[in-house]
Amino acid sequence: THCLSSAASDVYKRQTLEAQGDEYVKPYNLSSLRVLGTVGEPINYDAWVWYNEKIGGKTANIVDTWWQTETGGIMISNLAGISRSKPTYATFPLPGIQPCIMDENGNEITSNNAEGSLCIKYPWPSIARSIYNDHDRFKSVYFSSFKNKYFTGDGCIRDEKGRYKITGRVDDILIVSGHNLSLIHI
């Protein structure tokens, strides 16, 4: 008999599974799961609790990752068995990654308990180098909003312990009846 010790899911697969109800997962022995990954969109609190309780049995480490295709790999995430997860938080930057939070005036917010636009201070080995046949667009999209910083397009919160929570896109906003909505709210 072989047992899985880790599994990962994006928000849509998790929502589909959760919509089936708890009865769908009860017949399965998931006790071998030690690590559960979450990717794609930031996970909301209720989904995190469900994933933790129903799939992870309250014992699996939940690894909430933040990355983009353009970053070439995971940038912010807790490390299973090393750093504790916090519901809805990607938590800490991986070694060598130096995120920062910028305010709407282009100033870096250096204190904890901060909210603003997520940027990355310095290059890292897997960073995208350009957009095919459109290097000017690459520079405009990722490096023009905040001087000498990679602009992710995401908002974030940094809590009192320096953990990062991704709050959603700041550059994909819909205005509905006078309310600004990020796609994470829809």
Name each model feature, range by range:
Residues 13-17, 43-46, 69-73, 108, ...:
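Flexible loop/turn segments at secondary-structure boundaries
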Residues 110, 119-180:
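Conserved ATP-binding/catalytic segment of the ANL
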Residues 4, 102-103, 152, 158:
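Hydrophobic alpha-helical segments, especially N-terminal targeting/anchoring helices
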Residues 1-8, 12, 184-185:
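Single conserved hydrophobic/aromatic residue that forms the stacking wall/gate
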Residues 42-45, 78, 84-133, 141-147:
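Adenylate-forming AMP-binding core of the ANL superfamily, especially NRPS adenylation
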Residues 40, 67, 91, 154, ...:
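Active-site glycine-centered loops adjacent to acidic/histidine catalytic or metal-binding residues
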